[in-house]
Amino acid sequence: MDHRAFFDDVAKGKIAPCYVFEGTEEYIKRSALAALRKKLLPAGLEDMNEARLTDPDANALIAAAETLPLMADKRLVLVLESGMLSGRAKDYDEAKSAAALCEYLQHPPESACIVFYVRDKADGRKKLYAQLKKTAQIVQFNPLDEREMTRWIAKQLKGMGKKIASPTCQKLIFTAGNDLYALSGELEKLAACAGEREEILPEDIDAICVKTTAYRVYDLANTLLRGDAGQAFTLSRALIRDGEETLFLLALLQGECRRMLAVKLLRGAGMQPDAIAGKIGAPPFAVRQMYQQVARYTERQLRDMAQCCMDTEYQVKSGRMALEGALEKTMLQLLRIRLEGKA
């Protein structure tokens, strides 16, 4: 099941005897665990009715699950970093423990709710995982898509007494990224910045939000297209100073140039910005800006810019160009292509 189905079940009081929480979206995963705790554990008796075990063997896990709850219907047994689901088990015989648990979990106790909390994905080849697929609820916590993230942001801001327009929300996601832990911190900052004003504005995001590397490279590419050499080199130096690798930045810059070329071609075919965004998998907010900018450039110029980045990356990797200064040389070439309209 996905996280939405899990939250629905918990709200209705439908609690399974055993769960596996897996997937890369840690914020929602932790929220799900908090919701389960709140549903299962009486206030004031949480510590008495929860066992937290790190990579336990079968005996330790079974002992915790068999312990009766105190003034509660169920006891929560949280299993962290189980080597029987991911990684390599230590300090015990994995095969023996997995076999014992597979047998035990065919008929888990009604007085316990066992949660295997896995960072990232469980190893599907493990014997225990194969058994859990039959007897437990596997809950997948995958990254939210843009629509889900927009709803999540609106809900968080509503709790703070704020609101945000859809285009501004798209700008926020593109600027700050899709990590919900980071976004939750940015939302608190935005709410504080807005003060008594109810609506979060685009300029609030520009003023206080921490920008992702991808956004900063996008900003660098746009600055180059505007011909603002001074600002472009200021941005590139800041990226290098913050520890970003030159080859990584070249690859991102190449991606931005290729994306701008795609926008140019699709614009020429009569497509509108939102349709282009869906086709090339780019944020609508960014595509709407590119849509206006690429009108000032020929297809040849944009092709030459993308090729320039590719050539530099190849020359650096093949040892024909020194890594130091490669980004700056590429930027100078892009500025020349902008002015001359040829490579």
Say what each PLM segment does.
Residues 1-343:
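Conserved beta/loop motifs at nucleotide-recognition and modification sites
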